[in-house]
Amino acid sequence: MVFVFPFPFFSYGFSSFLEAGKKASYKMYYAEPELKTTRTGRAVACDAGSPRIIRVTLKDKIGLSERFTGRVFCYLAVACAWLSQYYHHTCAFFILYVHVCVCFLFFRWCLFATVSLIHESQTQAGSAYYTK
């Protein structure tokens, strides 16, 4: 038995899900002050009194923004519409579209989870983010 999502509900529900995930994906990091060398060769910390807070978005780092995801959904809809002409079934387009989109979402989630794990391990290892 196949459960078919209506197209508008599925796209609207996914966009609100992305918006909620976007708010949760921001992490705050304290940046260590940059060291600059003076003419005498002495290292001086710039803005040493107040560490700056940097907002890092992992989705933007790996290129999986909402605009990219929306574009992929449009391409998947066109591909599924083209493929559905070979199937003699009334809901062939929706069945194909839902299955392909669920596979894409699972791949996107796995990639995002892997990158965030790598990012967390690098942050805990002591790599600092500096602002220019």
Swiss-Prot record:
A GO cellular component entry from the record: membrane
Top-level taxon: Eukaryota
Topological category with respect to the lipid bilayer: Single-pass membrane protein
Cellular compartments annotated: Membrane
TM spans (from-to): 92-112
KW Transmembrane (keyword) present: yes
Keywords: Membrane, Transmembrane, Transmembrane helix
Main location: membrane
Protein's name according to its UniProt entry: Uncharacterized protein YOR268C
